[in-house]
């Protein structure tokens, strides 16, 4: 062999007879790469947290009161609408002796009943229109402007409906009992249907008045708490 030719090196392994040459051991990963792998896995698997603006734990009590306000408005809508319908359909004709000699009792002949029907219809329409605003307060209980607006409107509706219910209640009592000093005889002994409808309308309107009182108190307490 000449000195100019490169020498060929044949590796020799110390293995037992019948076994093949051992495989090469895997190269160890650099420390920086090994440390970066768990960090990357933690970064990809960690859940992302989004800020919850509309649903905060601190607003839980305010949201419950706002939801109660929404339910009370639905509950007040039924009696107000029933009072308006019952008053508007109060009409009865009483025949005496012949068909040509009749007595008639109609709601528009009594200003108090006409006022009750208009007030109940306005209150029912207001309650229906206020439901979307109340729903917004449920979703965003931190808003104070809508609460204050609803409080002012509820107070106005409370005064209007109370006046109509009180005026109609006085006429209903006079129709049932009469007045001996003024020589006013009770008419409910003859006009049973008319008195029944007007009495039911007065009861329904006072029920709506009571719910409006709860709405005003609840709204005032919520604003004071904020």
Curated annotation (Swiss-Prot):
Pfam annotation, one family: CASP_dom
Cellular component, GO, one term: Casparian strip
Bilayer topology: Multi-pass membrane protein
Transmembrane segments: 65-85, 113-133, 148-168, 201-221
Protein name, entry field: Casparian strip membrane protein 1
Family, as annotated: Belongs to the Casparian strip membrane proteins (CASP) family.
Natural source organism: Triticum aestivum
Annotated NCBIfam families: A_tha_TIGR01569
Record note on quaternary structure: Homodimer and heterodimers.
Keywords of the record: Cell membrane, Cell wall biogenesis/degradation, Membrane, Transmembrane, Transmembrane helix
